[in-house]
């Protein structure tokens, strides 16, 4: 079945991206975008899981890539390791909702042919709401525990980080545009 072939290829793409440094570029972009919030590294973890899940389609690949990079950074900044693990584990399932999602592909097959493109379009809002709600809860906990806030980045840092992460973000647009447009 051609639809089932997408699953191992999404996982392979996630592993290749992790080894190629895309996860690190996405984490740096998330740092620039959300680094000024209380518990900034926890917010970076959530945003990076959402971005990486949107590229790889796999929550497991997202958890491994982002968690392996973020856990040492959070420990160095004084975050409780249990809190860091909880944030990573609770935010990686957003990769199951934000397309392309392996779970939505399997659901399409099991349900008797529900349109994968329609499922992918329906996954964006719940995935984003899940990420935003996790960020609210994380912000409250981080403020109570007194976790650090990163300094405000300069415009040059924002530009440089965005330019470096742009190919990663264009990959999401290419994959989703191809699937929704019927090219893939």
Can you describe what each PLM-predicted range is?
Residues 1-184:
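Alpha-helical transmembrane segments of multi-pass membrane transport proteins
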């Amino acid at each position: 079945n051609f639809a089932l072939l997408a699953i191992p290829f999404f996982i392979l793409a996630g592993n290749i991206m992790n080894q190629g440094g895309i996860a690190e570029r996405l984490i740096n972009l998330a740092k620039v975008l959300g680094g000024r919030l209380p518990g900034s590294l926890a917010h970076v973890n959530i945003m990076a899981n959402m971005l990486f899940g949107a590229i790889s389609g796999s929550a497991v690949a997202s958890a491994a890539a982002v968690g392996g990079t973020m856990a040492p950074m959070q420990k160095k900044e004084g975050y409780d390791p249990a809190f860091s693990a909880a944030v990573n584990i609770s935010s990686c399932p957003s990769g199951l909702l934000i397309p392309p999602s392996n779970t939505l592909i399997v659901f399409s097959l099991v349900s008797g042919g529900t349109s994968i493109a329609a499922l992918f379009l329906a996954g964006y809002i719940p995935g984003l709401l899940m990420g935003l709600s996790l960020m609210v809860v994380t912000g409250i906990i981080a403020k109570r525990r007194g976790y650090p806030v990163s300094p405000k980045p300069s415009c040059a840092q924002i530009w440089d980080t965005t330019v470096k992460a742009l190919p990663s973000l264009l990959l999401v647009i290419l994959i989703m545009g191809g699937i929704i447009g019927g090219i893939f």
